[in-house]
């Protein structure tokens, strides 16, 4: 049975932590530690994870009986993050989700999906966005092939590469930066999409720039992707690890 029967995709684990934690940790590594999470399908799982974060990540002593007491031993470093968790609707499309968190946004802000990891330099991305002065920036990445690649000479295998990067063409890798003006292109109707409509309109108005990230990127779309990312983590080859 698929893990996403029981939890949102962003809570599927790489190693001992959800992929969502890995994404947030990457932002925090570059000095960005204030987060607003747009919750949808099984959003309560994410709320409970962060509400009980100390319990999940430290040793605990439980005293039973009349003088019941729980002591959490803070034996692990605690992330200095501020997280606002917002219920935006189970079937809401992405544009509407972003519009529904507008009250928590004061300045330029970043947006990413909850299922993609990368070694992108977030600080460089933000600098690029500030310099061009347009409303939005999207990160373009080279996707990985779904299949292993074999290099051969005269029938002899010289190299086997699991899920190599496809060098031709780039795709939307997430990791957006926006001015607050983006909210003028969104609305709170649940059918307000993000890529179809708002980003297309920004493109027509010459208000969307692309930051070409030439490093590594991967997305957890399938169980096979989960196995691949966990294998990188287990081998110490997790390119996104901060």
Protein language model features and the residues they cover:
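Well-ordered alpha-helical segments embedded in enzymatic catalytic cores
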Residues: 19-23, 96-100, 198
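Catalytic-core segments of class I nucleotidyltransferases/pyrophosphorylases
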Residues: 109-110, 117, 121-130, 142-145, ...
